[in-house]
Amino acid sequence: MKPGEKQEQLVKAFKALLREERFGSQAEIVTALNEIGFENINQSKVSRMLSRFGAVRTRNAKMEMVYCLPVELGIPTINSPLKNLVLDVDHNGVILVIHTTPGAAQLIARMLDSLGKAEGILGTIAGDDTIFITPTAESDIDELYDSVLELFEHTG
């Protein structure tokens, strides 16, 4: 078997394992890959693969924290069904806060970051289900708030 074919099989197996949404640690992924014939896999290789494919830890149907692949790998757009993932938008006069469904904050933040300063966004910080958005100027907070509400079709 050619080296490229082995790598392709590894990637296929890796993605298939993550789709099962049952692996809570990198060590569990290493063990599963070893068991199906990929002996030269270690934690650092799995870590690089998780980063390469944009895998995130989120809660599965059993509410366990597991690794999974993102729904989309490209830069999300507002035409994506992302608005369904936003639960609440609020601000305190200085910073905007968005609450999302579990595991969705980083995806939403990535889309917001792609809008950038032209839309009044200086930067975002995302956790699992919460995003902080800093406006380009404190005086723009109300305008940014209204824009984000409109973007995700929420009412204030």
From Swiss-Prot:
Pathway membership: Amino-acid biosynthesis; L-arginine biosynthesis [regulation]
Q: Which Pfam families match?
A: Arg_repressor, Arg_repressor_C
Keyword Transcription among record annotations: yes
Question: Does the keyword Cell wall biogenesis/degradation belong to this entry?
Answer: no
In which compartments does the protein localize? Cytoplasm
- Which GO molecular function terms does the record list? arginine binding; DNA binding; DNA-binding transcription factor activity
Q: Which keywords fit this entry according to its UniProt record?
A: Amino-acid biosynthesis, Arginine biosynthesis, Cytoplasm, DNA-binding, Repressor, Transcription, Transcription regulation
Look up the record and report any one GO term of the cellular component aspect. Answer: cytoplasm
**Could you mention a single GO BP entry for this protein?**
regulation of arginine biosynthetic process
Q: Which Gene3D superfamilies match?
A: 3.30.1360.40, Winged helix-like DNA-binding domain superfamily/Winged helix DNA-binding domain
Q: Which InterPro entries match?
A: Arg_repress, Arg_repress_C, Arg_repress_C_sf, Arg_repress_DNA-bd, WH-like_DNA-bd_sf, WH_DNA-bd_sf
Biological function: Regulates arginine biosynthesis genes.
Q: Read off the PANTHER family from this record.
A: ARGININE REPRESSOR
> What name appears for this protein in its UniProt entry?
Arginine repressor
What species was this sequence derived from?
Tolumonas auensis (strain DSM 9187 / NBRC 110442 / TA 4)
